[in-house]
Regions:
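Class I SAM-dependent methyltransferase SAM-binding "motif I" and its flanking Rossmann-like core
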Residues: 95, 101-169
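Short, flexible loop segments at the rims of nucleotide/cofactor-binding pockets, characterized by
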Residues: 13-17, 68-74, 101-105, 161-163
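A general structural motif
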Residues: 5, 33-36, 89, 122
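C-terminal and late-domain segments of enzyme folds
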Residues: 1-33, 42-53, 57-62, 139-141, ...
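General beta-strand structural signal in soluble alpha/beta enzymes
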Residues: 10, 67-68, 93-94, 125-128, ...
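Portal/gating segments that form or line small-molecule/metal binding sites
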Residues: 37, 43-101
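Hydrophobic anchor at the start of a short beta-strand
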Residues: 34, 66-67, 125, 209
């Protein structure tokens, strides 16, 4: 990476609800843009229009417009106009929902390529819950906690969202099954792990972000600079 990439945020869930102000204000400021593009892909089977409406109301309260880009199917993800819209955005936000559907829709698609290009050109990219999970490779498989192939915007780490509320047995499995050099990061709801353009990491929110390497708790400084 050449240092021009944008801020990258892994949000632990409960996006666009009271308590997320600190996270989203920081992202709006980093984007320095009047509009956030919301991809409700992971919520395709859970009334994605409601996710967009929630985002619109939430970001309006922060002085920013939100618009939904209905990339819900594999066909949508290959649409060149939708890809162009993603490429032109300065702030992209992947909603929560089904990480497996999100991965299958975006993997190797025109929209995913455009998102990567936008981020490398300085756009802010945020993902919450499912949206956070798929951005890494490997990623946590929500069906049992094992690790599987993710989209790999960053590597060397995997994200467990809803940390502190997720099934403890599944979380334990994710931590213990991880390779010895892989960081498993637990992010609580309404909190975020944020990668800055210089490759450094910070946590935002009222609850601590937890990092595990080799099955043991470590600090944020254990995350590889840049995460790649």
């Amino acid at each position: 990476m050449d240092g021009r990439c944008g801020v990258l945020a892994f949000v632990g869930g409960a996006e666009w609800t009271d308590g997320c102000q600190a996270v989203d204000r920081a992202l709006v400021a980093a984007a320095d843009a009047a509009e956030v593009t919301v991809l409700p892909t992971a919520a395709a089977f859970e009334h994605p229009e409601k996710a967009v409406a929630t985002a619109e109301a939430w970001f309006a309260g922060l002085g920013c417009r939100a618009r939904g880009l209905m990339v819900l199917t594999r066909g949508d993800a290959q649409d060149e106009q939708l890809a162009a819209d993603v490429r032109a955005s300065r702030f992209l936000y992947l909603s929560g929902g089904s990480p497996m559907h999100l991965r299958s829709v975006l993997k190797g698609s025109a929209v995913w390529t455009a998102l990567v290009e936008a981020w490398l050109a300085g756009a802010v990219v945020a993902g919450s819950s499912a949206g956070a999970m798929v951005l890494t490779d490997p990623m946590v498989d929500p069906r049992g906690g094992a690790l599987t192939v993710g989209l790999g915007l960053v590597t060397g780490m995997a994200v467990v969202p809803h940390f502190g509320h997720e099934n403890a047995e599944k979380v334990h499995r994710s931590i213990t099954l991880a390779a010895a050099d892989l960081a498993v990061v637990g992010v609580p709801e309404r909190c975020a792990l944020v990668r800055q353009p210089d490759g450094t990491w910070q946590a935002i929110g009222d609850e601590p972000v937890r990092v595990f390497v080799g099955g043991e708790p470590v600090g944020l400084d254990a995350l590889a600079r840049g995460g790649r």
